[in-house]
């Protein structure tokens, strides 16, 4: 609800920036940052580029996948990649800042991070969300393979250094992938 007829106060965050408070002018849509709690620290940190990529799945659907590159990324070098497996099983991989699963921190250690919005995550329609129900080792796991296979085909990925990470349902996913990955992953 607006605090007056033309202004909203909101929190905004991204993979590269923790929560800050902003004002949105409802008339001209101007956004003004009100808090700068993390500015001094963030000004000293180089974040990796975040890329939104739509990857084809094994059943020919498009899946939003976030790619986070290491800071100072050089496309002429080879990088290891980490597949981020979201928990839940029904919570989306959005532009979020996390102290627990900070994808920028992982990228800062030289990894390309692959974070797909596999089946079972909301925000992509009811069919996409419900597909996982009763099919935990099914299409959503194929979605993970689609994401890592698409990214490992890039010339800057060392396909002999692929890993997968996750907790909660993401941890279940790691164990499932460990038994079915056909030698894709090393860790």
List the predicted regions and their residue ranges.
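Serine-hydrolase catalytic core recognition
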Residues: 1-187
């Amino acid at each position: 609800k607006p605090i007056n007829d033309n202004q909203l106060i909101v929190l905004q965050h991204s993979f590269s920036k923790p929560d800050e408070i902003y004002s949105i002018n409802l008339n001209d849509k101007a956004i003004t940052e009100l808090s700068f709690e993390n500015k001094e620290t963030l000004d000293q940190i180089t974040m990796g580029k975040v890329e939104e990529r739509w990857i084809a799945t094994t059943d020919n659907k498009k899946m939003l996948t976030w790619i986070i590159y290491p800071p100072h990324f050089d496309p002429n070098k080879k990088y290891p990649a980490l597949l981020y497996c979201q928990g839940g099983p029904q919570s989306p991989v959005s532009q979020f800042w996390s102290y627990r699963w900070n994808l920028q921190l992982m990228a800062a250690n030289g990894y390309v991070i692959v974070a797909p919005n596999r089946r079972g995550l909301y925000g992509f329609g009811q069919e996409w969300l419900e597909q996982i129900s009763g099919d935990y080792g099914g299409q959503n796991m194929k979605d993970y393979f689609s994401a890592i296979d698409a990214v490992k085909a890039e010339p800057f990925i060392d396909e002999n250094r692929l890993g997968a990470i996750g907790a909660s349902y993401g941890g279940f996913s790691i164990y499932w992938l460990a038994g079915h990955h056909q030698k894709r992953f090393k860790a």
